[in-house]
């Protein structure tokens, strides 16, 4: 039995990650594909993260970074097991979000990556670009929904993409019409599922 693929969607807030994940789930109807999003707000760490994001509680940046990281590690074994059982996971945000947001607040990229080192490695990371319209919509109730901060996050994403580090990035332009974007992403995901080989890798090892 071939293993499943770990396919991650990344991008700024309101870039359409969840929409595209749901498009994939609807357009590839199969019992071998599951959706997972981060942060998972139902866990102990997730509830603390939710309180922070919704401004109910405050923590220093180092604690916040570790909470987000721990939230992903809570699901590392689950992800590994699902992939080995032939289940493809469509993941809405992953370690790259953690690093981009942490470094946008001034954390060391090397240190931030070290916290995530060893997590199951994605077979494909789809980065959804945001046009100026989408970026300017980033004003909301949650703590990171701020235009200036999102611009900083974008620069950190660009650094990771440029560095590469054996990560298969696929950048989707914000210029595409929605129906074209949907079809393009579906084809990219199908190809990734059909071509995945070898054991599950470890991220940043």
From Swiss-Prot:
The keyword Hydrolase does not apply. Disulfide bonds: none annotated. Pfam families: Thymidylate_kin (PF02223). Induction: Expressed in the early phase of the viral replicative cycle. Its EC number is 2.7.4.9. GO terms for molecular function: ATP binding; dTMP kinase activity; nucleoside diphosphate kinase activity. Keywords: ATP-binding, Early protein, Kinase, Nucleotide biosynthesis, Nucleotide-binding, Transferase. ATP binds at residues 11-18. InterPro entries: P-loop_NTPase, Thymidylate_kin-like_dom, Thymidylate_kinase. It is an enzyme of class 2 (transferase). The keyword Iron does not apply. GO terms for biological process: dTDP biosynthetic process; dTTP biosynthetic process; dUDP biosynthetic process. Homodimer; the dimer arrangement is orthogonal and not antiparallel as in human enzyme. Poxvirus TMP kinase is able to phosphorylate dTMP, dUMP and also dGMP from any purine and pyrimidine nucleoside triphosphate. The large substrate specificity is explained by the presence of a canal connecting the edge of the dimer interface to the TMP base binding pocket, canal not found in the human homolog. Belongs to the thymidylate kinase family. This is Thymidylate kinase. It comes from Variola virus (isolate Human/India/Ind3/1967).
């Amino acid at each position: 039995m071939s293993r499943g693929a770990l396919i991650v969607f990344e991008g700024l807030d309101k870039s359409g990650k969840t929409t595209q994940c749901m498009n994939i789930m609807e357009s590839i109807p199969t019992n071998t594909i599951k959706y997972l999003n981060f942060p998972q707000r139902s866990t102990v760490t997730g509830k603390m993260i939710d309180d922070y994001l919704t401004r109910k509680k405050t923590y220093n940046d180092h604690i916040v970074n570790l909470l987000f990281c721990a939230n992903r590690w809570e699901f590392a074994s689950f992800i590994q097991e699902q992939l080995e059982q032939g289940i493809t996971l469509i993941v809405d945000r992953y370690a790259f979000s953690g690093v981009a947001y942490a470094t946008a607040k001034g954390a060391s990229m090397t240190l931030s990556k070290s916290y995530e080192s060893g997590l199951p490695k994605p077979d494909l990371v789809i980065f959804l670009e945001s046009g100026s319209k989408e970026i300017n919509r980033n004003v909301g109730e949650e703590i990171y929904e701020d235009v200036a901060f999102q611009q900083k996050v974008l620069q950190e994403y660009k650094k990771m993409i440029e560095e590469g580090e054996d990560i298969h990035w696929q950048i989707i332009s914000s210029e595409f019409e929605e129906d074209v974007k949907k079809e393009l992403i579906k084809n990219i995901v199908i190809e990734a599922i059909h071509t995945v080989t070898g054991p599950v890798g470890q991220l940043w090892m």
